[in-house]
Amino acid sequence: MLAFCRSSLKSKKYFIILLALAAIAGLGTHAAWSSNGLPRIDNKTLARLAQQHPVVVLFRHAERCDRSTNQCLSDKTGITVKGTQDARELGNAFSADISDFDLYSSNTVRTIQSATWFSAGKKLTVDKRLLQCGNEIYSAIKDLQSKAPDKNIVIFTHNHCLTYIAKNKRDAIFKPDYLDGLVMHVEKGKVYLDGEFVNH
């Protein structure tokens, strides 16, 4: 009897997971699977996901000044002028579908500048915990989400954080370029990775 109950619970768990993945894949015509195994989630699909539950979107910062020949915005530890333009373009596209979100960044010049240009005036909260890229980042995300359970969250962080999350949550190899992102959500105290954000 106990074995049957355990088997039944496992079956239900896998069924729920499969339903969730199917829902993500079927939410929009642009949704597909990346070569790294992550579902691709565009703006429209993200907006539909956000209707089901608040989403947490983590972006890598824009183009670094110290690793580019392009003109710097200001501080050499920050981003380039091209990076500001790219961040603003991404922010405009994102806000067209999801305008209501809380904005956070790690405490580096490049993430703060990226978030500022992305948001076009929205209040930015800097949180040094978002620079930590082990399990600590999950605790930070859950804490931020608990402060406003019904709000979407946008976080500007770093490539090694995104790489860690993709590997840890889905065993996927994710090497994000500038302003690439991941889509997550928090449910019953656990952080789930929904897929890779694709700006179309």
UniProtKB/Swiss-Prot annotation:
List localization entries. Answer: Periplasm
Listed GO MF terms:
phosphatase activity
What EC number(s) does its UniProt record assign?
3.1.3.-
Q: Which GO terms describe its cellular component?
A: periplasmic space
Q: Which GO terms describe its biological process?
A: lipopolysaccharide metabolic process
Q: Where is the signal peptide?
A: 1-25
Record keywords, A-Z: Hydrolase, Periplasm, Signal
Question: Record's InterPro entries?
Answer: His_Pase_superF_clade-1 (IPR013078), His_PPase_superfam (IPR029033), LipoPS_heptP_Pase (IPR011310)
Pathway involvement of the protein, from the record: Bacterial outer membrane biogenesis; lipopolysaccharide metabolism
Q: Which cysteines are joined by disulfide bonds?
A: none
State the NCBIfam families in the record: PRK15416.1
The protein's job, in short, is: Catalyzes the dephosphorylation of heptose(II) of the outer membrane lipopolysaccharide core.
Indicate what this protein is called per its UniProt record.
Lipopolysaccharide core heptose(II)-phosphate phosphatase
